[in-house]
Amino acid sequence: MTEVVVPETAEELTLPTVHPEVCKATNKVDDVWKRRRILIRDIICTPDKGLSFVGKMITIGGWTRTIRKQGGGKFAFVVMNDGSTFDNLQCVMDSEKVSNYEEVLKAGNVGVCLQIKGVLVKSPAAGQPVELHATEVVVLGTCDPAKFPLAKKRHTLEHLRDIAHLRARTNTIGAVARVRNSCAFATHLFFQERGFKYIHTPIITTADCEGAGEMFTVTTMLDEKVKDIPATPDGKIDYTKDFFGKHAKMTVSGQLNVETYCCALCDVYTFGPTFRAENSHSVRHLSEFWMIEPEMAFADLDVDMAVAEDYVKFCTSYVMEHNADDLAFFEKQIEPGLLDRLKNVLESPFVHLTYTEAINVLTEAAKTHKFEVQPYWGLDLGSEHERFLTEQVYKRPVIMTDYPKEIKAFYMKLNEDGKTVRAMDILVPKIGELIGGSQREEHLDVLERRIEEMHMSKSTLEWYLDLRRYGTVPHSGFGLGFERLVMFVTGMENIRDVIPFPRWPKNRSEERR
């Protein structure tokens, strides 16, 4: 152990030195951004791993990963993380130079919140170019190791779901959160750079975009006694007496609403929460999740497919560039081969095949491969079929088109055969369906006929039909489940582990304790 040497004078490094651009908007450097706290990311994630800052006085704030005493207790190594990066920064405390040395040691071992000021020096240890030699340490939050649920090193993901309010402090969920952030930022970047307008669509709605009926009801009448809830003569709840005067629900998709702006602003997208009242406990479904739904005017299915493929590749590339440390962790701990899989996505064109061609491939494969559900024309393919195509047959993403109209939504444009629609799904390894999209039916008479065939309520869709009555335009779009995208780029197996507070039947994560 080398002696902790602190120069008598050391230039203090503050945030604007690293990121001066954040101060341009207000010019209030000292008042706003000069907080005398540097993100660990801005030190060790630089090209030289922080060596250019050696000799600078800096202040960091974060939480302890470990505290280890050395030299008979004269020194202590404090491993700090502030969530800005996967990597930690080691800080060295000298009992003779940190006045509250014993207080720091008594504060706990894991999860203690500290603010540490010191000089950055070149580290003598292998694997860490720099370390921080502390001069001042402030204990902001103690953490009793006997009570802290994350005190031990490793926890199962199932256990972490029971303490969702604390699990962001773990390596795995922290890395997921950073990748999720990058995917969200990349989403806006992709569409904004291409001239799309971001539209906020409603969460409370009366429209069922999918026609599935698996929607949550929004009502204020449950505050009353059951016997006092208004009912119609046939015994059903009388929603005309409810808050909105009709049966209001939580949206399953923002697509129909965002189409209204597509027919005025051309290229638009929505990115927000959606809700499904499906009694599903699978690793691919949630009751509350986020959807990205672009709509493009003057666009056919070919345009739709091209934009969707570009979007997937753009997000994948962005994460690989900006979250290399997190992906290295996932490669080591979650999915060996993850990086090769993602590189293959970037370097290979997606396979294009029709639904009918896919059924033929699966039917032939069924002669030697056992599927839980045997493939046949008209089957709504499951994840076992989708993953077989992407992982076993083509070994890359697949864009499947021209589905039977019976298994797709009413708004999808009919092909000339009258049996299939101009729909497309993007299937990817590990996940199966990642994106679902279509060219929308722009002809009023055809759309009305489809609504009737599917026994849907035309009266609740009159506003949607107005888009075809007044200046109809050919347009296309797609929807992507954001959590599935995060699963795809991280290798995480369960969708409940890629959203901060997962909701599924009989569960509300952070409220389970």
Predicted regions and their residues:
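Short aromatic/basic micro-patch
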Residues: 131, 352, 479
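Ca2+-coordinating acidic residues in Ca2+-binding motifs
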Residues: 136, 357, 484
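Metal-assisted phosphate- and nucleotidyl-transfer catalytic regions
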Residues: 208-238, 310-430, 453-473, 511-513
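Alpha-helical packing segments of well-folded alpha/beta enzyme cores
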Residues: 183-187, 304, 311
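Hydrophobic alpha-helical scaffolding
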Residues: 53, 177, 248-251, 261, ...
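Intrinsic disorder/low-complexity signal
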Residues: 1-37, 512
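Class II aminoacyl-tRNA synthetase-like tRNA-binding/catalytic domains
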Residues: 2-6, 32-299, 466
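TRNA-recognition modules of translation machinery and tRNA-sensing kinases, especially anticodon-binding
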Residues: 245, 249, 254, 262-273, ...
